[in-house]
Amino acid sequence: LEDRRLVELFNRYGIRGTFNLNGGLPRPERIPESEWVELYKGHEVACHTYHHPTISRSPLDQTARQVLADRMQLEGVMGYPVRGLAYPNGSWTPEIAALLPALGIRYARVVGDTHDFAMPHDFMTWKATCHHTHNLLEDGKRFVELYKTQYLYMMYVWGHSFEFRTEEDWALMEQFCQLAGGREDTWYATNIEIVDYMADAARLQYTAAGDKVCNPNAQSIWVEVDGRHYEIPAGKTVALV
């Protein structure tokens, strides 16, 4: 139920979120499905398995069933393909990670903090920068002070809205949103938007001379050349001069 307050806070400061839901758990203390579409508008709904089992101890075929059942339940409500996952209880194995693409999953978040801002090397074992109770403001201050444009920086905060037990917890998150939100130099994106954008960026087609680039994708991609920024619109070829 705390998702309602958290989404309102995110919306106020322009923060985007990904919300991992279990389609098969009882709902007396959970937000009813009838509210999902409106509540999570502008954010992403992603999988967390159907019943939240410890999947590293489950048969692989039953893990597949958990993921697909959750996808189908969430997609039936949200009306779009659900392509992300947070491992339940942080439980995973290399075999599970290798299985997920065949189940339509493009990324999966593990438990733990990096306290770093680098892009992940493997989106199937995506570790966040920090939990919302672990150096949130300290990491946030370091993030907004970054300035080297030759790197791709990302700050990713994970956690659970039910862990906000006191007004002090909510005040801390609002401080972070005030610090990090509404910045013109920051793209506020959901998990799947980041994954899709990076995949599309990798598909850009450059001339051998490096003076033109074609974008075969369905969204604009931005590149920087010699300090100048170029928007490469979908389906267009742009001269980099």
Predicted regions and their residues:
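C-terminal domain-boundary segment and adjacent tail
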Residues: 12, 27, 75, 107-116, ...
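Short coil/turn linker and secondary-structure boundary residues
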Residues: 31, 58, 135-138, 168, ...
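Generic hydrophobic alpha-helical segments
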Residues: 6, 70, 140-144
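Metal-dependent polysaccharide deacetylase catalytic core of the NodB/CE4 family, i.e.
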Residues: 13-106, 112-130, 153-161
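Short acidic, Gly/Ser-rich segments with clustered Asp/Glu that frequently serve as metal-coordination loops
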Residues: 1-5
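A Trp-anchored, charged/polar loop motif used as the substrate-binding/catalytic surface
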Residues: 131-146
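Non-membrane alpha-helical structural segments and their capping/turn regions in soluble enzymes
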Residues: 60-65, 137, 167-170, 174
